Amino acid sequence: HISANIMQLHHSKHHATYVNNLNVAEQKLAEAVAKGDVTAEIALQPAIKFNGGGHINHSIFWTNLSPNGGGAPTGDLQKAIETDFGSFTKLQEKMSAVSVAVQGSGWGWLGYDKETGRLRIAACANQDPLQATTGLIPLLGIDV
């Protein structure tokens, strides 16, 4: 269970700030491109990565939530979890361990590896987006 206060904070403060700051950075980038100012374009990349990543990560996070959520998955996802981790409980344990090990701010992720056709667990620092950082397709994110 995640409290309403935590969800409100994540939506109204964190996610909204990432979107607003990304919009500002994209506007500055457009101006730099129009001027041919490559130095400014390069200088804006960290802000675009951080705020764009925060927007992407939180957008995925919202899709992972449900008022009636919880419990083990069924169907193809259940089969993939059992194949790649042994059981849903083992997946939970590994996800928790990887997420807790993140130093400072970051994300624990369950992702799909298109090259191997397998599920993998990964962590990303700060707001680094999973797919851009690891190539994995994000399925479930834990904000830490």
Swiss-Prot record:
Reactions this protein catalyses: 2 superoxide + 2 H(+) = H2O2 + O2
Main location: mitochondrion
Residues bound to Mn(2+): H10, H58, D143
EC numbers on record: 1.15.1.1
SUPFAM superfamilies: Fe,Mn superoxide dismutase (SOD), C-terminal domain (SSF54719), Fe,Mn superoxide dismutase (SOD), N-terminal domain (SSF46609)
Co-factor binding comment: Binds 1 Mn(2+) ion per subunit.
Gene Ontology MF annotations: manganese ion binding; superoxide dismutase activity
Cellular location(s): Mitochondrion matrix
Cellular component GO terms held in the UniProt record: mitochondrial matrix
Quaternary organization: Homotetramer.
Name of the protein: Superoxide dismutase [Mn], mitochondrial
Origin species: Petromyzon marinus
